[in-house]
Amino acid sequence: MRRALIAGNWKLNGTTQAATALATAVRDGVAANKPDCDVLVCPTFTVLSAVQGVVAGSGVDLGAQNMAVASSGAFTGEISGEMLKDVGCSYVILGHSERRTLFGETNEQVAQKVASAYRDGLTPILCVGETLEQREAEQTMQVLEQQLLACLPVLPADAAKQQQLVVAYEPVWAIGTGKVASTAQAQEAHAFIRGLLAKELGANVADAVRILYGGSMKPDNAKELLGQADVDGGLIGGAALKANDFLAIMDGLTA
């Protein structure tokens, strides 16, 4: 049985004061509500250490939003997985649609980062998803397949480590556009991803990998989305910046 994961991607938001206040509210809410899921917050790099000071030992895990391929060296502006581990991170988001579209990250670069995350002892949250143009051209499954197949060959050979992979499906066309992906569309994409994982890695791995929904999950749609057979949690953006909304999404797992 896959344990749900509710992950908050704080993106480019939060001074130290604001981030620690949000982390405190999330930590205290999780302690009070005891949601039936794993909980993760992914702040911006500059506040990782401060947020870790708030959530350490609380059951709320810490993650980063990106990482470098290299471990060290002359790579100005980059942050390595070893550095992320050093401040308490256990997860890292890779291949987010904003990294792909705004910063030109390719499938090959994302694959290199996935390999580096495993090397450095971090659990990768691999983001995949199609644009509006690709969906309207009925290329959704083709895009998902290309993005996944670029990364699966770099996974460790050990099935137990393969099972640790987290995949996040981001229908890019449904993020901040006013368009909404139906639960049926979400489930269809998640089922396709799991089927591809089964084909490439085997059923045991596919059945264990958690697939998160990253298409503007909010308190008012979380319960229905989280009720789908292949939706194992959410990668939450805007709603993660308000503790009450973030905690309310977790209620969708038990309500």
Swiss-Prot record:
InterPro entries: Aldolase_TIM (IPR013785), TIM_sf (IPR035990), TrioseP_Isoase_bac/euk (IPR022896), Triosephosphate_isomerase (IPR000652), Triosephosphate_isomerase_AS (IPR020861)
Reaction equations catalysed: D-glyceraldehyde 3-phosphate = dihydroxyacetone phosphate
Annotated GO MF terms: triose-phosphate isomerase activity
One GO term of the biological process aspect: gluconeogenesis
Residues that, per the record, bind substrate: N9, W10, K11, G176, S216, G237, G238
Main location class: cytoplasm
Transmembrane segment boundaries: none
Record's keyword terms, sorted: Cytoplasm, Gluconeogenesis, Glycolysis, Isomerase
Location of the protein in the cell: Cytoplasm
Pathway: Carbohydrate biosynthesis; gluconeogenesis; Carbohydrate degradation; glycolysis; D-glyceraldehyde 3-phosphate from glycerone phosphate: step 1/1
Active site: H96 (electrophile), E170 (proton acceptor)
Family annotation (SUPFAM superfamilies): Triosephosphate isomerase (TIM)
The enzyme's E.C. designation: 5.3.1.1
Gene Ontology CC annotations of this record: cytosol
Pfam families: TIM
This protein's record includes keyword RNA-binding: no
Subunit structure: Homodimer.
Function statement: Involved in the gluconeogenesis. Catalyzes stereospecifically the conversion of dihydroxyacetone phosphate (DHAP) to D-glyceraldehyde-3-phosphate (G3P).
HAMAP family per UniProt: TIM_B (MF_00147_B)
Family in the record: Belongs to the triosephosphate isomerase family.
Name this polypeptide is given: Triosephosphate isomerase
Taxonomy of the source species: Bacteria, Pseudomonadati, Pseudomonadota, Alphaproteobacteria, Magnetococcales
Gene: tpiA
